[in-house]
Structure formats: C-alpha cells, structure tokens
Amino acid sequence: MRADKSLSPFEIRVYRHYRIVHGTRVALAFLLTFLIIRLFTIPESTWPLVTMVVIMGPISFWGNVVPRAFERIGGTVLGSILGLIALQLELISLPLMLVWCAAAMFLCGWLALGKKPYQGLLIGVTLAIVVGSPTGEIDTALWRSGDVILGSLLAMLFTGIWPQRAFIHWRIQLAKSLTEYNRVYQSAFSPNLLERPRLESHLQKLLTDAVKMRGLIAPASKETRIPKSIYEGIQTINRNLVCMLELQINAYWATRPSHFVLLNAQKLRDTQHMMQQILLSLVHALYEGNPQPVFANTEKLNDAVEELRQLLNNHHDLKVVETPIYGYVWLNMETAHQLELLSNLICRALRK
C-alpha cells in the first residue's frame, strides 16, 4: 500500500469506528457461511460456523491476516490429522489413544504460550471436534475435519474483503493524539487563566492512548515494509512529549512570581505559538499524507532565555525563584527538539 495516500473523510469515519465495522463483517460472514451450508446441505454443518467465528473474531487488521491465516490453517490441518490418528488408535487401544490425545493437547498448550498462540488453539479445537465423533465412524470424523478446514478458508476469504489497514489506523490515532496534546498544551499555558487548571486526567489519557498505539506497530510495519524502528521512535517521542508536558505545567505554575515572569515573556509566548503550529502541521500531514519537514526554531527559544534574564533583573525585588523559570524554558527547548525529531520520523513513515 502507498504510505503517502491521503485519507478521505469517509475512511477517517470508518476507521474511527473500526470495531463496529469488524463486528458487521463477522455478522455478515456468519450469515453467508450459514446460507452456503444450507444450500449445499453439508453434513456436520455446525463446525464450519464455529471455526469461522473462532478464526475470524480476533483478526482485525490486514497486516495480521496473512501470517495468522497460515497459522490457523496449519493448526487446523494438523489438528485434523492428529484427531484422525486418535480415532484409529481408539480401535486398537483406548489407553494408547488417551496418551496420544494428551500429547497432542500438550503441544496445543505449549504453542498457545509461544509465538504462535492461534496455531496452538486451532490444533486443540480441531482435535476436540474430530475425536468427538462416535467410535469407529471415520466418515463423520473426515466430514468434521473438512468442515473445519472449510470454515478456516471462508474466514480468511471474508477477512480479506475490504480489510482494515493497521497503518491507516495508526496514522489516525497518532493525529488524534497530537491534536489532543495540542489542546492540553493550549489549556495549560493560556494567558487567560488565573489558577492552575486540573489536567491530570487528560494527561493520563494521553499517556494511555500512546501506550495503546504500540499494538499497531507490528501489523503496520508488515503492511508498509517500513522498519519497526521508525514506529518505535515515533512511539517513544510521543510518550516523551506527554511526560515533558506534565513537567512544563509544574514549572509554569510553580510559584506566583515566576508565573508572572513567564507570562510577560513575549518571545516565549511566540515560541509556544510556533510549537502549536508545528503540531497542527504534523496532524495535517498525517491526514493528507504529504509531509513537509518541520524544523523547530531554537533561536527563538534562545532569545526567550535572554529575555527572561532581563525580566529577572527588572524584578529583582520580587523574590522570584529562578529554577522553575529556567526549567520551563529548558523543557520548551527540549520539546521543540523532540517535535523536530518527530517531524523527521513522520516524513520517513509517509515516504512515497
């Protein structure tokens, strides 16, 4: 897929309600599978439906479909073979059949806690379905094996129809996170406030949303072939910005005299507006897919430091504590640097 593809309003609306879309797809797949079973009068018709729901339910993004498809189909076929062997062993010796099933379920549990949990799950489910056939009825067992494989193939087919892209979902979530960050930033440092705003819940939500985005990195990297290190770098910077914002708020509202000094620093306010514009441009780039490198103007921040020194000299009679002031300015400089790095990484992620 093209990483720089512009997102239409319809796509944005659909991906913001991706759980509803996925639920609708599962429901339609269930109904179509049911009609296929009834139309062709397939014996043991319960098992294609069960298999389709078990396989299709957890799959949500296209980057997960292909690798998990092979895992699921491989688990289904292996489970069917193990089940058929178990039924043959039952005709020879029941204890031998039980030992065989125990070994197969051990394999199921061992894989379920490894890198291929769905394959282990399907081995166990398919084995249970096949060995549940009446003793000696190999035809029933074969039909059940075929039904499970049919359900797996139908699940893969329906999942591949208009699949959701983890990369697009990642872009929307990152744009949403930066937009919310910008709102909190404006609320915290608004010159119209007399008291410190209560933003703890908003900061916690920003941090929680940033952590949730980590689950999109692996499938998005598979879809776009963009190295995971770029996504990881963006993830780290996004989290760092939230943490630094909390420290900035603490320094900005540390004491009343220092707050007034910061409030009267014109170049510092200009710098704040500059960073807000950077955030808006990054959000626009994520939606439009046409990024332009944004370089933070650190010279303005250096001018702000000089202006603050002059303000401190003019207010020497007010017992102003310099630590929160220079701490706030340094955090602004570091935030600008992080935004510059974030801009470069987003440009690399949205390359043509």
UniProtKB/Swiss-Prot annotation:
Record GO terms (molecular function): transmembrane transporter activity
Transmembrane segments: 26-46, 47-67, 69-89, 91-111, 118-138, 148-168
Keywords: Cell inner membrane, Cell membrane, Membrane, Transmembrane, Transmembrane helix
Predominant place of localization: membrane
Membrane topology: Multi-pass membrane protein
GO cellular component labels: plasma membrane
Location within or outside the cell: Cell inner membrane
Pfam (any one): FUSC
Topology feature Cytoplasmic, residues: 1-25, 68, 112-117, 169-352
InterPro entries reported in the protein's UniProt record: PHBA_efflux_AaeB/fusaric-R
Periplasmic side: 90, 139-147
Protein name in the entry: Inner membrane protein YeeA
Lineage: Bacteria, Pseudomonadati, Pseudomonadota, Gammaproteobacteria, Enterobacterales
